[in-house]
């Protein structure tokens, strides 16, 4: 009889105001006192002194630190094997690029990875995969769930609002992704892990029920970040991204191929979640309320996104992951989604012809 499976969870999980200035103490408590630091482009000037002072005060030795602006897998392999042998951890501070680069470098060297996101734009900071350029093509490659996640809500608050909107879009996508996963199992094309469903569902429900006056409220940001972190754990349990990535993500990935300059991942995903929630006839009022009340739609209306691009993306979606069987893998639901793009009142307001 199979007892169960082993899974990794973060040993360090610190999300709150001022967390970045306490990073040294968090690392020292785990005996991670020899580290390599990677900062996102321009972030040494913004956060370098705060981080270095915290590490120095707690006698955590920085073996080397650099700014990174690449997700090319060849660059990262070279970087990984230049990490000193006595390093005990790799730390990435910044956005998606440097998080993915550091995560993969740590994976190659079998070192603990500490994820320190400076924006809330997606759940990538907590995921066990990295989005890298492989022979010029954006590719999701396996890595490992972060050993530590440290997020300073004050840092998140001072980032441009578009990153918060992106995080909101990525978070609510769990509503449609979970429904796709269950739909897939019913079609005989996959197997749902009930515990992963529970974790992902609890994450999104905790977020969408949070009271707030502003999207920069401490409680709102903490709930958003907590929930994004839980999403990564749901994927780890499932052994895939199915609990958090469904038809709405396929639309976004298709838009990445169609658009010369794609929008932030979570912005595209948020719009696609609204479309798919209506197609699925599943919790679309909740999705609509969150997007309206947070100001997400007002932001989207400034982006001049085109209806025609979404129509193309819906048709392209099944080819992005042909092994899946989401709602969009069936023609009748693709047609329903396209009809919605053409006729829905909200989409008519925020998308252009």
Place the predicted regions along the sequence by residue.
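Solvent-exposed alpha-helices and their adjacent loops that cap or buttress functional pockets
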Residues: 5-7, 30, 82-85, 106, ...
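A glycine/threonine-rich phosphate-anchoring loop and its flanking beta-alpha core
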Residues: 108-203
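Short glycine/serine/threonine-rich phosphate/pyrophosphate-binding segments
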Residues: 44-47, 97-103, 122-125, 244, ...
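ATP/NTP phosphate-donor binding region
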Residues: 1-89
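Active-site segments that bind and position negatively charged phosphate/pyrophosphate groups
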Residues: 194-301, 305
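A short, small-residue-rich loop immediately preceding and capping a beta-strand
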Residues: 83-105, 109-120
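C-terminal charged capping/lid subdomain of soluble metabolic enzymes
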Residues: 171, 282-353
């Amino acid at each position: 009889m199979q007892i169960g499976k082993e899974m990794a969870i973060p040993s360090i999980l610190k999300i709150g105001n001022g967390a970045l200035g306490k990073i040294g103490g968090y690392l020292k408590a785990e005996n991670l006192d020899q580290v390599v630091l990677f900062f996102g482009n321009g972030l040494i000037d913004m956060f370098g002194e705060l981080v270095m002072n915290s590490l120095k005060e707690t006698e955590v030795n920085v073996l080397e630190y650099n700014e990174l602006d690449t997700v090319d897998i060849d660059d990262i392999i070279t970087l990984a094997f230049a990490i000193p042998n006595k390093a005990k951890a790799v730390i990435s501070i910044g956005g998606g690029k440097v998080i993915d680069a550091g995560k993969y470098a740590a994976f190659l060297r079998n070192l603990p990875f500490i994820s320190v996101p400076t924006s809330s734009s997606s759940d990538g900071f907590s995921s066990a995969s990295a989005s890298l350029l492989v022979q010029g093509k954006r590719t999701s490659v396996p890595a490992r769930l972060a050993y530590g996640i440290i997020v300073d809500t004050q840092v998140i608050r001072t980032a441009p609002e578009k990153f918060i909107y992106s995080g909101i879009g990525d978070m609510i996508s769990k509503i449609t992704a979970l429904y796709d996963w269950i739909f897939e199992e019913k079609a005989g094309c996959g197997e749902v892990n009930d515990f992963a469903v529970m974790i992902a569902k609890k994450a999104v429900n905790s977020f969408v029920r949070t009271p707030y006056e502003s999207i920069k409220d401490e409680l709102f940001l903490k709930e958003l970040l907590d929930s994004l972190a839980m999403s990564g754990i749901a994927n780890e349990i499932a052994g895939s991204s199915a609990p958090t990535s469904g038809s709405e993500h396929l639309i976004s990935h298709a838009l990445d191929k169609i658009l010369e300059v794609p929008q932030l991942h979570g912005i595209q995903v948020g719009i696609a979640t609204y479309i798919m929630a209506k197609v699925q006839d599943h919790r679309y009022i909740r999705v609509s309320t969150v997007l309206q009340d947070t100001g997400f739609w007002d932001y989207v209306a400034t982006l001049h996104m085109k209806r025609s691009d979404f129509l193309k993306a819906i048709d392209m979606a099944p080819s992005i992951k042909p092994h899946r069987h989401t709602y969009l893998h069936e023609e009748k639901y693709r047609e329903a989604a396209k009809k919605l793009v053409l006729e829905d009142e909200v989409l008519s307001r925020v998308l252009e012809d």
